[in-house]
Amino acid sequence: MQDYKRAVIIGSKQTFGKGTVQNVIPLDNIVRGNDHGDLGAIKLTTQKFYRINGGSTQLEGVKSDIVVPDRYSYIDLGERDQQNPLGWDKITPADYKVWDGYIDFDEAVKSSKERMAKNEQIRLIEENAKWLKEQQDENLISLNYDAYVSKEKEAKKRSEKFKSLRDYDSRLTFSSLQYEQELFTQDSVLREKRDRWHKDLARDIYVEEAVNVLKDLHKNNIKKKENELASVKG
């Protein structure tokens, strides 16, 4: 979608980049006469995926067009943070054409970046992410009781600042598809699940920005059609 310019990717710096095919090999099939019980299994990489532009998704993943922080932006989580990960490489690109259905695609991306840079909620998420990284890197624990308690109180006080992240309200409203709404009369559990999901979506600033980007692209697409009609009439 990104290579064809049919989508704007919004999110962290990159996806985890798991661009491989793996097979699970039971070790019991290899070791004969095993008296030690289940030996478990290992995963072997047998194939790799490539994008139409020739690049692998392994290690580098898909880089976002609009980078926004999340709580774990600075935490080492992916395979790229481990020892000896399978490297990124590139092959000959496929023969493809970029979709030209949007006008001012880059302008929509630029507008989103400007909104994100000014958003106080995003700044707070970034601050929270850096604080979590500090907590992860902290490897000294005082054996003095008073010093330890003081440090814990300080951390708790600082964490209070980030509780407001859970209270964010985009004021977006969501509704289930018609067929699900019909099921609600018979399935109250499904209704409760959807209600919780919709509330979570309303608190999600990334969903809110995705809607804003879609609005920009929609407006720009309308402009394109108006320009085409004007040129035909002219």
Where are these regions (language model features)?
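Conserved functional hotspot residues or short segments at active or partner-binding sites
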Residues: 51-230
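Conserved acidic, small-residue-rich alpha-beta core segments centered on
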Residues: 2-90
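Cysteine-centered nucleophilic/redox motifs
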Residues: 1-2, 210
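Terminal low-complexity/disordered tails
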Residues: 232-234
